[in-house]
Amino acid sequence: ASKTCPSNTPLSCHNTTVVQDTCCFIPSGQLLQTQFWDTDPSTGPSDSWTIHGLWPDNCDGSFPQTCDASRAYTNITDILTAMGADDTLQYMQTYWKDYQGNDESFWEHEWGKHGTCITTLDPGCYDDYVPTEEAADFFSKTVSLFKTLPTYQWLADAGITPDGSKSYALDDIQSALSQQHGAEVTLGCDGKTLNEVWYHFNVKGSLQDGQFVAAEPDGAKSTCPDDVYYDPKK
């Protein structure tokens, strides 16, 4: 299990001095839960966005990547099964999809590039460490966070549903999602078509057990034009 963290740990990106205990504090503490809306080819259910990943940015918007090649695991399905994370795996098989159909290599990429850069997942941050358990924690946390961010439902509640024949004001989409999230979000487009959203968080404590707090984006809020298309999945 991961080590217990003190309750007075500062919120990431809000510390005034360097925090030495990186098992209970993430220096790259702007965490982004990123989601796809894939329509061509489509992935996942027609009434849900899908998981892209969980990314640690530095507080200035830059980001580390591929931080430990020795832990770039290549058997995520086996790891999750061995660690008893069957529910997480089953959920990922529906909601964490690769548009080219190779989910396993997509998961390996997300773990190796981003997961290995989250300091609280370092093997030294565990009591009685079992090899690969930190990867299971990464995927389980990403899934549980994604479940709290139902983009499709939040947009539908604001009257914004996929429609191939009309466009929506980007401001209306931003407003609907930021009101629910508690901070602005980052919206991504392919041309004029909405296809990605990033929810930003800071964390008090570890990734495994800490508190995620909505945070303002650490960069541009959008790559989209003022009016966008939100296409139905094919």
UniProtKB/Swiss-Prot annotation:
The active site is at H52, E110, H114. One of its GO terms (cellular component) is extracellular region. GO terms for biological process: RNA catabolic process. Its EC number is 4.6.1.19. GO terms for molecular function: ribonuclease T2 activity; RNA binding. Glycans are attached at N15, N75. The keyword Hydrolase applies. It is an enzyme of class 4 (lyase). Disulfide bonds join C5-C24, C13-C59, C23-C125, C67-C117, C189-C224. It catalyses: a ribonucleotidyl-ribonucleotide-RNA + H2O = a 3'-end 3'-phospho-ribonucleotide-RNA + a 5'-end dephospho-ribonucleoside-RNA + H(+). Keywords: Disulfide bond, Endonuclease, Glycoprotein, Hydrolase, Lyase, Nuclease. PROSITE patterns: RNASE_T2_1 (PS00530), RNASE_T2_2 (PS00531). InterPro entries: Ribonuclease_T2_eukaryotic, RNase_T2-like, RNase_T2-like_sf, RNase_T2_His_AS_1, RNase_T2_His_AS_2. Transmembrane segments: none annotated. Pfam families: Ribonuclease_T2. The keyword Signal does not apply. This is a base non-specific and adenylic acid preferential ribonuclease. Belongs to the RNase T2 family. This is Ribonuclease Trv.
